[in-house]
């Protein structure tokens, strides 16, 4: 086992990364090894997808499968070995199919089929035991003694960034947003990473390409969500429970939320969002369901307590899932799509009747809590609508600075930095937030500036796209570069989606971003210095010191 993809990973003087019997996230060594082997097989599929494309062969089913299966290897997504094995077996079948199609096309064109790299040649074992015996060939640091640590760090930066992009591709696909050109470039990068390059310059350039690719993917996802559910609107949301039977929907998948809402109409069940599903409450399409009553709980790391206290059924539509046995709710939590936990019921297809039956059988909430309201819904359209007023308030001096504070949440104590930062921002500043990092301060009162709320909840982590659009619009109005705006970006990272959002911002030339609370363990000191020198990327320090720098206070 070697896994170093999330903030929780082990850090010791002897080296970083989880490499024993179990990772800090709870992932067993066998699961980690199977996921590495799955990635290896997917890279082999991409090798043939690239070669097949050169001869005009495009398989949309395979284009969708590879990022979806890759998504299953993100932090806190799938802990079920049997599901990972099944993905690997399917990858082997798809690779064989593409290989046959490619070789036939070569024969018809009078060409000799090209030799493929080792990553596309493995004969996958037929059982879990056999696959585990093959896992060493796919270990991410298998050649660590033969290469410079910076090369390994760059490979991992690319791999983990591409994982984040794969997740957004799958979220977009669910909403019928696909792009053959994007899929083709995705395969090219997967195939390149499968070759274990030692070219640092090419790896760094690839990391930037992944950021650019993800910008297109986030635009696709934005289109999918707004075309399916309308543009988010500023919306007041209750964060307390309501009397009645209950279903809690966590993750990121709004299509699943829509299906659950449709199937619970007239059933006497209240539906709540959780975590990154909170922004759904601002979409017009969901407002026609009066039984979507609000948001329950907070960010992913608190789920074992929050789900244990929730007297209904829980659906995990995507990351992040953690051990449901700790809170003794494994019999009433359901996984969906790429999510998996051993022994937990998995919903296949679009029938959520098992979830509904479980909710009806459970007690539900016995009384209404005193409501606590927050305002959400400041995504792209709402931000653009507010732009003229924002510009006027900047010009008259009422708004002097913007802060984008968001990203992933986590359970480390030093994440209180983000709470204190938000509370310490000047009264003449605007705070934009997104991702589950918002839960560090989104229930606090920040007031407004001439009717403009000081705290603007932009949405999910992928809605960084909306914040980027606002920054571009403001830069155009003020005829300046984005980096010349009175804008400071402070991103909390935990896993691979945050990595790819960061790569996207860097690839767009955004500078002087702060990340925290700890730097990724796979980034060497040399790589961190390169990123600081090139982009001004730095780690958070103290709220007081960082604010002085961001506000240019001597």
Swiss-Prot record:
Instruction: Give the UniProt family note.
Output: Belongs to the HCP family.
Gene Ontology cellular component list: cytoplasm
List the EC numbers from the record: 1.7.99.1
Q: Which reaction does it catalyse?
A: A + NH4(+) + H2O = hydroxylamine + AH2 + H(+)
* Cofactor(s) needed by this chain: [2Fe-2S] cluster; hybrid [4Fe-2O-2S] cluster
Which BP terms in the Gene Ontology apply to this protein? response to hydrogen peroxide
What are the TM regions of this chain, as residue ranges? none
Annotated gene: hcp
Source organism of this protein record: Shewanella sp. (strain W3-18-1)
Q: What is this protein called?
A: Hydroxylamine reductase
Could you tell me the keywords of this UniProt record?
2Fe-2S, Cytoplasm, Iron, Iron-sulfur, Metal-binding, Oxidoreductase
